[in-house]
Amino acid sequence: MQHKLLFSAIALALSYSAQAVIVPEGTQLDEKQHIVINNGAEPQSFDPQKTEGVPESAVAYQLLEGLVTSDSEGKLQPGVAESWENTPDFKTWTFHLRKDAKWSNGDPVTAHDFVFAWRRLVDPATAAPYASYLSYLQVENAQDIIDGKKKPAELGVEAKDDYTFVVHATNPVPYAVSLTTHQSLLPLPQKVVEKLGDAWVKKENYVGNGAYNWQTTLLTKKSNL
């Protein structure tokens, strides 16, 4: 089965990732499937924490899956997290991850990958455009880490075990779950990023957990009007 993602300024061929997608029982998929996304510019990067434009987010949501997703009507749906709950004061949110969620290299997607990604987001060394997003989410120590007053390891997130991700907020955030759909909060394959650094985002190194795998990239030479 083959999936393709096409752009007006860039053509990106993606293959179907069976590990990441849950297909409803009885659904018959075509042998070849295509998604066409009309972007106005070439994506700068496929690192979800180092980009901020629409072209990049359009790709990121195909290559990576977050804690929750939204359907065509904007309603929240389980992503890597199959369920979640909060304390009565809306300051602590616990996400229970699917044990069958896999990275495209076969490794399991764990709570540690989310902890790593969120810490990396607020780390000043990352220079992430949306670093302040975790401050908006009221995550403990987020702003102090961004300002260089505390270490990324002090961010208010934890992996209670491989499949339980916990977020601690300084103030009540009743809408926290909906905020986790943002591209900057997508997980990253910790082992791969730690080993390769910024080179992890190259096509030959890219590891995702979304519905598609990155295969080829082709810059267009002309426009068809």
Where are the language model's segments positioned?
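Gram-negative bacterial Sec-dependent N-terminal signal peptides
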Residues: M1-Q19
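A structural "hinge/loop" feature
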Residues: I22, A41-S57, V80, D107, ...
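Short, well-ordered beta-strand elements
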Residues: E31-A41, E82, T92-F95, F114-A117, ...
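Surface-exposed binding/hinge segments that line
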Residues: D113-V115, V122, T126-K191
